[in-house]
Regions:
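Active-site microenvironment for binding and transforming phosphate-containing groups
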Residues: 1-186
Length: 186
């Protein structure tokens, strides 16, 4: 939920995403509210500009020592963040899309993944795990995944183009889709 913040109108009230068109000062104050409510105050709050793609960014010394302008550029088109930097709070924004958190318990690496249908059909989770493996030696058996809430099957309808994109990429359609005769959609 987004209650208890400073934003007005469409962004009411606890919007923390700076890429929405909300007032910058309201976003800053909302971020302050969130950070001050956490058990341990983060040193960094990292929020990417998501594009429903599959790109993952590792938040490490390169990012942390970059200028504000460089950081802004690095966060463009990113739908997953990975880090093992202490005090670094990685964030994603979702509405209908699915938030997924990953934790590599052996290497103390975390990831936050924004999984919309476009990212899912193009294996964003696999790309994120591959990047964790390449960078930190993450093994799947050591990863704990937490899948957050998103839109339900009954509320999310798609046309043939989305169905076909998943089918062509090898997804088991009997398990993830349902034909709705009344609307002629899945």
């Amino acid at each position: 939920t987004r209650h208890g913040g400073c934003s007005q109108g469409n962004y009411a009230s606890l919007n923390c995403t700076p890429y929405t068109g909300d007032e910058a000062e309201a976003v800053r104050r909302n971020q302050e509210i969130v950070c001050s409510s956490l058990p341990q105050r983060p040193q960094e709050l990292v929020i990417p500009f998501q594009t429903h793609g599959t790109k993952a960014l590792v938040i490490d010394g390169t990012y942390l020592h970059a200028t504000a302008e460089e950081r802004h550029s690095m966060l463009q088109g990113i739908d997953a963040l990975i880090t093992r930097e202490p005090g670094c709070c990685i964030c994603i924004s979702t509405a209908d899309c699915i938030p997924i958190l990953l934790y590599d318990r052996k290497n103390a690496v975390i990831a936050a993944v924004h999984a919309g249908w476009r990212g899912t059909v193009n294996y964003i989770l696999g790309h994120t795990l591959d990047k964790m493996r390449a960078r930190y030696g993450t093994e799947g058996k050591e990863v704990i995944a937490c899948i957050g809430p998103g839109i339900s099957l009954s509320a999310f309808e798609v046309g043939d183009e989305v169905y076909e994109a998943f089918r062509k990429n090898g997804f088991q359609m009997d398990y993830i889709s349902e034909w709705k005769p009344a609307t002629h959609k899945y």
